[in-house]
Amino acid sequence: MKEQKKVFIKTLGCQMNEYDSARMHEVLNEHFDTVKTDDYKDADIILINTCSIREKAQEKVFHELGRWKGLKKTNEDLIIGVGGCVASQEGENIIKRAPFVDLVFGPQTIHRLPEMIKQKQKSQQSQVDISFPEVEKFDYLPEPKAEGAKAYVSIMEGCDKYCSYCVVPYTRGPEVNRPFEDVLAECAILAEQGVKEITLLGQNVNHYLGPMENGQTADLALLIHFIAEIDGIERIRFTTSHPVEFSQNLIDAYATVPELANHLHLPVQHGSDRILINMKRNHTILEFKQKIRKLRAIRPDITISSDFIVGFPGETEEDFQKLLDLVKEINFDQSFSFIYSKRPGTPAADLPDDTPMEVKKDRLKRLQDLLNSNAQIISRQMVGTNQRILVDGTSKKDDNILSGRTENNRVVNFKGDKSLIGQFAMVKITESLPNSLRGELI
């Protein structure tokens, strides 16, 4: 009989981490009969899945660990583990700073968690494994367990871009693609469990080049075509993309695959070619615009979101104005925007940066004001339209109100029977609010 363990997992960062955290629980459950808990004080295993994109990420992790340290006094068998990108960066240093930590594991070694726990219990020594064993983890992970009608599926790991500001190639390793048939099998398993929307994940997901059993290679467009043929899958998304690999094949898929959501997240990071060169993004603004123009020729009403960095070393007011001009021209929807965060070990960390923080904060506010204005206009334009909603559950504020998302990722709240949860429903949008929409079931 398997030993029962209560597991608490705190997830920081991107959708890839959310996917990894779900798989952590599944692999632990195979060995220990685990039960999820939302209270870390009640847990037998506490894991934090970390993100290192932003500045001071390490300190946030050690602050969280400090909250858990005292639990060892009342539960000497408690296992505390640190995973994710901070674990990859810091490795043994985590144990040196926090000797009470039992496990340190990278994104590519989550499948080894049960064995690491057993080794810790046997030797009473902290276990560290931050290696990059390519896609080995997918060979050893159990079948995925769906939670609701939406699911993430990781199709590749790592990144080869080495943008000058980014730590991902150092923490996630080089690009490694999951075999084509393996991805299809995982999607089919999820569809059998009632999943209707799949989000394909990768640090540079549109550079997917998956090996096929026939010896050929499948790109993302071909993968999407095959996933769309799986019975039950009715909506497909993918993230995160790079403009360089946003290929004509992928653009054409928007014409031939109706299951592809009418929304694209395509990080451009800046609107100035000079800044893009210093970021080592390997494309120009003109090339980005040309790809968007081709996409909108196929899907005129598609909404496009992005990621933006302001205050990159050497950014002038002229550079920043070019960013604002791009946001206006493309009409970017809900997007992520940040002040540049220096990451140790990256080339950009050595660039001279003499822009005052007050100026950077002002630029960020101006950018976010423009992005929010764009998003509100798009939301108001949806009032009176009929939208196909995938019903996620009930509203956070009212258990008698259903809540779901449109193709362009808007939250819609409306009255309806709870039997609709996990299903698609047609809803007429009646009101636009700052962070959501209201509607009526048709």
UniProtKB/Swiss-Prot annotation:
It catalyses: N(6)-dimethylallyladenosine(37) in tRNA + (sulfur carrier)-SH + AH2 + 2 S-adenosyl-L-methionine = 2-methylsulfanyl-N(6)-dimethylallyladenosine(37) in tRNA + (sulfur carrier)-H + 5'-deoxyadenosine + L-methionine + A + S-adenosyl-L-homocysteine + 2 H(+). InterPro entries: Elp3/MiaA/NifB-like_rSAM, Methylthiotransferase, Methylthiotransferase_CS, Methylthiotransferase_N, Methylthiotransferase_N_sf, MiaB_methiolase, rSAM, rSAM_horseshoe. The lineage of its organism: Bacteria, Pseudomonadati, Pseudomonadota, Gammaproteobacteria, Thiotrichales. HAMAP family: tRNA_metthiotr_MiaB (MF_01864). Binds 2 [4Fe-4S] clusters. One cluster is coordinated with 3 cysteines and an exchangeable S-adenosyl-L-methionine. [4Fe-4S] cluster 2 binds at residues 159, 163, 166. Residues 5-122 form the MTTase N-terminal domain. Monomer. This is tRNA-2-methylthio-N(6)-dimethylallyladenosine synthase. One of its GO terms (cellular component) is cytosol. Keywords: 4Fe-4S, Cytoplasm, Iron, Iron-sulfur, Metal-binding, S-adenosyl-L-methionine, Transferase, tRNA processing. Its cofactor is [4Fe-4S] cluster. It comes from Francisella tularensis subsp. holarctica (strain FTNF002-00 / FTA). [4Fe-4S] cluster 1 binds at residues 14, 51, 85. GO terms for molecular function: 4 iron, 4 sulfur cluster binding; metal ion binding; N6-isopentenyladenosine methylthiotransferase activity. Catalyzes the methylthiolation of N6-(dimethylallyl)adenosine (i(6)A), leading to the formation of 2-methylthio-N6-(dimethylallyl)adenosine (ms(2)i(6)A) at position 37 in tRNAs that read codons beginning with uridine. Belongs to the methylthiotransferase family. MiaB subfamily. It is found in: Cytoplasm. Residues 380-442 form the TRAM domain. It is an enzyme of class 2 (transferase). Its EC number is 2.8.4.3. Residues 145-378 form the Radical SAM core domain. Transmembrane segments: none annotated.
